[in-house]
């Protein structure tokens, strides 16, 4: 039996071949010679213990011979680390019969060491040299880890703790890292600190002026009262304007139109008054007025043009004559009424009767205003009706003019041709025929 890995080739059997149990020729005192037993005991326990063991005949319990001292020297387990271990050098490195808690085994030389005062002194020296930027790069961390025999995690943790400690002690001499720096750009430099200092100086300079302004405000309480009254008046005016906008938009339109007409009428008068010759000024003023008159209706017509429904503008263009008459601008109130009443749909007074409202098609409830032919024919006849019927504004006409006679004759002819128009705006007995005629008229207007 040989064990070359243990350092010896064979083991001699302790018991001889002629044992008492085997051969029965020898006695128990001849189991092993005294010299062999003493040699084995002396190699294991030392000379005094070996003599005592041999005297008491313990040779049967020692399976090793004198040539095989397995434990020649034993070091103490409780001495310094430099002393030899419990195991003999002849044995190979043992494999652990358990899994260690960490990633390193107990006797592994790569196991991280605790940070000692000597290892952290190197890190402190590097930190003192880089007080303005205490953020080591990856290469610097690797270099410091090799020098101090520490891991990268330990080095990074130490620097983080050092920066936190300096920050608590108000000994920061570096600019904090911004978000752009974390993305890979350069770290904060001295220029950023200068910018912060400049901002602080500007704030300190502004503090004095702010204090002076606050003192002036405290010394002059009347200014606050006046400002409050101004703001209140302004808010009241704004609120009143908003109320007027909600309630009376037509009044504002009237005011604007009247203002324009006053300006147009005052301009030629001023020009006439400033002229030196009275005789020359009068025809000039009359000429200016004549020039102003045809140009003024487009201004009036342009204002409500945006509010016209498309269907009524088409109806007007289809029914207007080739030479529409132009009424001179004699009064501002009549023109403003025309502006308001142009092309609007209003409810007929006949809607008060249930017979008119209960029909399937109530075309007679709506009255079409400011259509050229209808206004010419109905402006005279319907003014004679009572307050219950709809009244139509009539354009001012000059007295004793030939145009008025022709217009009246044309209106009489239209009334004879279209008798339905007299009954379209007031309740009559024959409703079915009137309903059909009104529907035909409205459909013709809409199609045109």
UniProtKB/Swiss-Prot annotation:
Q: What is its main location?
A: nucleus
- Regions of biased composition (Basic and acidic residues) lie at 223-237, 396-406
Query: What's a single GO CC term here?
Result: cytoplasm
SMART domains in the cross-refs: HOX, IRO
Give its localization: Nucleus
Q: Which residues form a coiled coil?
A: none
Q: Which InterPro entries match?
A: HD, Homeobox_CS, Homeodomain-like_sf, Iroquois_homeo, KN_HD
One GO MF term: DNA-binding transcription factor activity, RNA polymerase II-specific
One GO biological process this protein is involved in is: positive regulation of DNA-templated transcription
Among Pfam families, the record links this protein to: Homeobox_KN
* Positions of the DNA-binding region: 108-170
UniProt key word Transcription regulation: yes
Q: Write out the entry's keywords from A to Z.
A: Activator, Developmental protein, Differentiation, DNA-binding, Homeobox, Neurogenesis, Nucleus, Repressor, Transcription, Transcription regulation
Name the tissues where it is expressed: Expressed in the neural plate in overlapping patterns with other irx members, which all share an anterior border of expression. Outside the nervous system and at tailbud stages, expressed in the developing otic vesicle, branchial arches, prospective heart region and pronephros.
Q: Where is this region: Disordered?
A: 171-250, 387-410
Q: Where is the composition biased (Acidic residues)?
A: 195-222, 238-248
Family (UniProt): Belongs to the TALE/IRO homeobox family.
Question: What does this protein's UniProt record list under function?
Answer: Acts partially redundantly with other irx members in neural patterning. Required for formation of the posterior forebrain, midbrain, hindbrain, and to a lesser extent, spinal cord. Both up-regulates and down-regulates gene expression during neural development. Acts early in neural plate development to induce proneural gene expression and specify a neural precursor state. Also up-regulates repressors that prevent neuronal differentiation.
What's this protein's name? Iroquois-class homeodomain protein irx-3
Q: Which organism is it from?
A: Xenopus tropicalis (Western clawed frog)
Q: Which gene encodes it?
A: irx3
